């Protein structure tokens, strides 16, 4: 017996700095690929809860015999050895050799929190019903019927070749890239999109495919989920029609940012290796093979306008240089680049893309927001093929976006006089929630100076700080505006010592930089040369950084969806150990409850309660609710307190020091102007040359 342990058992051992000390066994996203990229795998009952009438009652428990501890030991009796033929082990049946029953599909999908729904058409029918008490006509609105589907889930990527007819080249590329276990969104979407007849044998009308909407967490492999069916559909059509190596545009992928476009192109080229397909990103001067359609109305005013415009065109010099036409099989573009090309022809005309059969909207909720909506809808309308399949992918999707998509699909089918395809929705987990495999922290900093101090404490953690696990680089810092990102970069660029790389370890990326500068910064950050990347919401969506250990929201995001996408830059593909830190000041208190609610729901999914939770219940009760008008204003403009005023400046200098620096810079500028003016005056005072004859 240890007498010291016995005497000290009533004391609490202080673990000062033990949480923040470097732990070599601590899991981090930068440590490597997770063995299991799946987020959910719940235990689901395999039998019915209620017993049927014909089912016999369970057998009563049989009492075990009593043990006599003082009985004599029985003598061992020698038994003759019995020869037993060893059974030959039969090969284990693979998932591809048999189809699961509907009950088995339901259990497997439910264990991974997959909900697949067949969205019905919107019906405006209303039923008039008379009330007996008030004797007034009460209108009862008929709700849309939504049928839940239970397709065959994907157990491994090897099933795509055997059970769903995936191309051998694409299957080999998947093996080469290391894809083994599918994530939840891949488990539910790939069978439906690659071979819907095999995934849903009991459903009709699947010969032309389905229109698809997927809502899945960030980092769950949505890019692979829509690239594989698009590539396989093109290869299948080529083999059926025997078109050979003829290239024509058959799939268009629309993404909101250039960085996401380049990432999709890179992943697509890896999957298309050896197939002969071309995946190209659209640029400003890209010209595609398209048909010209006259959009003008037959009116005299339009004819007069055309005549006047044609006269003006005759006066202008004509450009007879032939334009080189790009012929990709899959085009990845931003909405405005494609819209600019489609409307680049003569007035009152528009180009259309009749050969496109797959239209994919990545981050569909932001593409259908007011900022991109007109361009996205015009791109969609330009795809005039009657066999067009449309799919929508995002981690967040509002009900207004879903209804808009449903109405567009219905109106397009009516205008082209075709039968609409089945519209299927896949939801993984809970809608509009952050990934459950990362930690969330809300830190109150009171002011802008407090934010800067808190960020420097994250850069240089001390052993006495026991506020949780430390945030280790590489990590992202999100700000509200470009000016704030630039100012924060100037303030922090010398905080890393020269021995560790100095100012080269910190960079800022935003839409104000050139394409080459943005590509260079992205390349250095992926290579590990840059440790801290300060950016705006331009990197909040879709961009995959596998080894990012954390995210710092220096400014509170403008919406709950914005927080979900920002926090989703870490914890990709099931990696654990990521941290999402959010700073908020006194000016952010009216809006921060949106973020707190998302954190609370995410931690509830992860099973964190009590002290483990990043947001306590008392904080949720104390924070004010965000009004609808404030929520809309915050989403469009952000926090107005960050846009102007002395309090919004990111600087550690005092007001007196800033005034002195501004006065000094003003004096230097004035001195330069006076020197230039003096030089101009001296040039005018030269020798007089007389009057010319």
Swiss-Prot record:
A motif (DEAD box) lies at residues 362-365. Residues 294-312, 681-693 have a biased composition (Acidic residues). SMART domains: DEXDc, HELICc. Disulfide bonds: none annotated. A motif (Q motif) lies at residues 159-187. Residues 16-38 have a biased composition (Polar residues). Residues 454-623 form the Helicase C-terminal domain. Residues 1-101, 288-326, 631-693 are annotated as: Disordered. Its EC number is 3.6.4.13. It is found in: Nucleus, Nucleolus. Residues 53-64, 313-323 have a biased composition (Basic and acidic residues). Its main location: nucleus. It catalyses: ATP + H2O = ADP + phosphate + H(+). One of its GO terms (molecular function) is ATP hydrolysis activity. The keyword ATP-binding applies. GO terms for biological process: maturation of SSU-rRNA. It is an enzyme of class 3 (hydrolase). Interacts with the U3 snoRNA and is associated with the 90S and 40S pre-ribosomes. The Q motif is unique to and characteristic of the DEAD box family of RNA helicases and controls ATP binding and hydrolysis. ATP-dependent RNA helicase involved in 40S ribosomal subunit biogenesis. Required for the processing and cleavage of 35S pre-rRNA at sites A0, A1, and A2, leading to mature 18S rRNA. This is ATP-dependent RNA helicase ROK1.
